[in-house]
Amino acid sequence: MPELTRRRALGAAAVVAAGVPLVALPAARADDRGHHTPEVPGNPAASGAPAAFDEIYKGRRIQGRTVTDGGGHHGGGHGGDGHGGGHHGGGYAVFVDGVELHVMRNADGSWISVVSHYEPVDTPRAAARAAVDELQGARLLPFPSN
């Protein structure tokens, strides 16, 4: 039996470390309920869009759902001038007590809102909950369109 050397130990560790991301990758494709979604064109969950939600959190109704391009805020673009187009949340809208909470999906897949802009979270549901926590009972005011 060959003697265990530092070189062989480091080589074995590198092989194991290289395999870990391959095992973790399929888990990253699960939606909010932990179920894997089929890769079907037009399926919002398959394209990375989070699942819709509608719940009462700390006495506030929070909702989230996908939106179509025609239903974007600000008349289809930033300030109604056609610039930007659609939601910053990549076709996803979040509401607190019926008032839209502006959310944005970051390049790394995390989400931020206009209320908790410097605290990224994993899902729009978590962004809505963080906003309710930050509001501390105050009413969410509509975001100005210009």
UniProtKB/Swiss-Prot annotation:
Residue ranges of the region described as Disordered: 65-85
Protein known as: Tyrosinase cofactor
NCBIfam families xrefs: TyroCdyMelC1
Positions with biased composition (Gly residues): 69-85
Signal peptide positions on this chain: 1-30
UniProt source species: Streptomyces antibioticus
Gene: melC1
GO molecular function, one term: copper ion binding
Modification after translation: Predicted to be exported by the Tat system. The position of the signal peptide cleavage has not been experimentally proven.
Keywords: Copper, Melanin biosynthesis, Signal
Record Pfam families: MelC1
UniProt function note: This protein may function to deliver copper to tyrosinase.
InterPro entries for this protein: GriE/MELC1_sf, MelC1, TAT_signal
Source taxonomy: Bacteria, Bacillati, Actinomycetota, Actinomycetes, Kitasatosporales
Family listed: Belongs to the melC1 family.
GO terms for biological process, alphabetical: melanin biosynthetic process
